[in-house]
């Protein structure tokens, strides 16, 4: 499967170009491939979230790719090229998670100030304040981890661990705050 397989016209394909290379990952190269009759998408994959970019299974049938389509001009560096994008990808996912978590917090605060029980806004109840404080803590911790990873990336430093931690924390924050926001909006 590959991202943008259905809607994309040009795709990056990682292919084994030297079957004798040791270790085995050394014999992979990255190519830009235009979709053609030799490149067929067999089906669009169903996704739970992040539907802005499609994913699809594809079949390559006697596909010929000219050497000039080799990315970077050096054969055998494909896996390294693919892996080098993981840090930035994880930071981007973390940033989305922070945005979701923060939006849930802001909407929850807004609603808690308007919704009333027992004659006062629910924001005045300690149990709601604790919930909102926990949500704010999730946002800030995820944001700080994401900014730390992004700063390291911008400096050209290795940040695979930081990016992974930020992605995990921000994804968990987005889930936690989404569930808490639904609970808080229960009477909406």
Protein language model regions, located:
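Glycine-rich phosphate/pyrophosphate-binding beta-alpha loops
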Residues: 1-5, 50, 88-89
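A short core secondary-structure module
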Residues: 1-40
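Short coil/loop residues immediately preceding or within conserved phosphate-binding loops
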Residues: 8-10, 42, 55, 160-161, ...
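Short, well-ordered turn and helix-capping elements at secondary-structure junctions
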Residues: 17-19, 43-45, 64, 188
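Short, charged, solvent-exposed linker or helix-capping segments at domain edges/interfaces
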Residues: 24-25, 42-44, 67-74
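Basic, amphipathic alpha-helical recognition segments used for DNA target recognition
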Residues: 33-38, 67-68, 102
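Flexible, small-/acidic-enriched active-site or ligand-binding loops
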Residues: 38-63
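Alpha-helical interface subdomain recognition
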Residues: 57-63, 73-77, 81-188
């Amino acid at each position: 499967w590959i991202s943008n397989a259905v809607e994309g016209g040009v795709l990056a394909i990682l292919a084994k170009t030297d079957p004798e290379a040791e270790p085995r990952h050394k014999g992979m190269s990255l190519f830009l491939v235009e979709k053609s009759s030799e490149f067929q998408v067999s089906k669009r994959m169903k996704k739970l979230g992040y539907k802005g970019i499609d994913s699809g299974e594809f079949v390559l049938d006697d596909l010929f790719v000219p050497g000039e389509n080799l990315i970077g001009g050096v054969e055998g560096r494909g896996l390294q090229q693919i892996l080098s994008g993981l840090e930035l990808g994880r930071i981007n996912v973390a940033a989305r998670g922070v945005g979701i978590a923060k939006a849930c917090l802001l909407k929850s605060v807004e609603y808690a100030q308007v919704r009333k029980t027992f004659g006062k806004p629910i924001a005045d109840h300690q149990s709601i304040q604790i919930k909102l404080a926990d949500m704010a803590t999730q946002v800030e911790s995820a944001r700080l981890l994401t900014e730390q990873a992004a700063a390291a990336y911008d400096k050209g430093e290795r940040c695979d661990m930081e990016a992974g931690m930020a992605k995990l924390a921000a994804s968990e924050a987005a889930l936690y705050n989404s569930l808490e926001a639904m609970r808080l909006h229960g009477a909406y």
